[in-house]
Amino acid sequence: MAEQQNPFSIKSKARFSLGAIALTLTLVLLNIAVYFYQIVFASPLDSRESNLILFGANIYQLSLTGDWWRYPISMMLHSNGTHLAFNCLALFVIGIGCERAYGKFKLLAIYIISGIGAALFSAYWQYYEISNSDLWTDSTVYITIGVGASGAIMGIAAASVIYLIKVVINKPNPHPVIQRRQKYQLYNLIAMIALTLINGLQSGVDNAAHIGGAIIGALISIAYILVPHKLRVANLCITVIAASLLTMMIYLYSFSTNKHLLEEREFIYQEVYTELADANQ
């Protein structure tokens, strides 16, 4: 039971095991493996942006007109090595505590649902912004490329905040040192989320994915926390309901027949395939 009371504070080497962070480590290694595959085997074009589009980046003109598969794939892609390094570091640091707090099944559910949901939220947000601006009537096709695990990471960060709030307020640790450490970790996570969102205000950052991932992660974790830990069937039902709601949202918003969107979709694919044909000559 001590493990459940103190997931964010490893007291001694004896309490640490590789198995306790196996899922977090697997997710980090998966992101690294996909990136190396991406740059070694899946980059036939000179343009980095075109390669990302070809491989499955989240482009709202494509994702909202049938390419729903871009949501899960884009969360495993990264634009460059620095982007990958920062995300993997954040995933490892935050994921360790989250995995020990919620367990592997819940962590995986929060990570996947938050990541895919963040990509959907980002795609629709971009469409909403542009369709309600003067850019919508412009003849230029504006492409925003969304890649990275940051939406999923924001989801597990928000879930960690929810867990620590419950621990600090409702079940404070009897040891003052551990109690202070948990408070510091809570404050640090809140500060990290706030700084990420503030940094996302600058151009070139997909802040909609950050916001969407954080909201989804928080909602799922609240549902998990409200259900007693031992009720596995109830926790499974929460996961199924969350996944079903996400699937329904994808179905409702990812098959648009908007003429303007479809024209831009055709233009983007034509440009990429032309570049691909030229590269193969």
From Swiss-Prot:
GO BP, one annotated term: proteolysis
One GO term describing the cellular component: plasma membrane
Q: Superkingdom of the source? A: Bacteria
Q: What is its EC number?
A: 3.4.21.105
Enzyme active site: 150, 210
Annotated membrane topology: Multi-pass membrane protein
State if Transmembrane helix is listed as a keyword: yes
Q: What is the effect of changing residue 150 to A?
A: Loss of proteolytic activity
The cysteines joined by S-S bonds are none
Task: Provide the transmembrane region boundaries.
Answer: 16-36, 76-96, 105-125, 145-165, 185-205, 208-228, 233-253
Its predominant location is membrane
Give GO MF terms, alphabetically: serine-type endopeptidase activity; serine-type peptidase activity
Which EC main class describes this enzyme? hydrolase
Give the subcellular location: Cell membrane
Question: Could you tell me the keywords of this UniProt record?
Answer: Cell membrane, Hydrolase, Membrane, Protease, Serine protease, Transmembrane, Transmembrane helix
Catalytic activity field: Cleaves type-1 transmembrane domains using a catalytic dyad composed of serine and histidine that are contributed by different transmembrane domains
Q: Which InterPro entries did the record assign? A: Peptidase_S54_rhomboid_dom, Rhomboid-like_sf, Rhomboid_protease_S54
Q: What SUPFAM superfamilies is this protein classified in?
A: Rhomboid-like
State the remark under miscellaneous: AarA deletion mutations display alterations in cell morphology and total or partial loss of yellow pigmentation.
The similarity annotation says: Belongs to the peptidase S54 family.
| PANTHER family tied to this protein | PRESENILIN-ASSOCIATED RHOMBOID-LIKE PROTEIN, MITOCHONDRIAL, RHOMBOID PROTEASE
Give the protein's biological function. Answer: Rhomboid serine protease that catalyzes intramembrane proteolysis. Mediates quorum-sensing and the subsequent regulation of target genes via activation of the Tat protein export system. Catalyzes the proteolytic activation of TatA by removal of its N-terminal extension.
Protein name as annotated: Rhomboid protease AarA
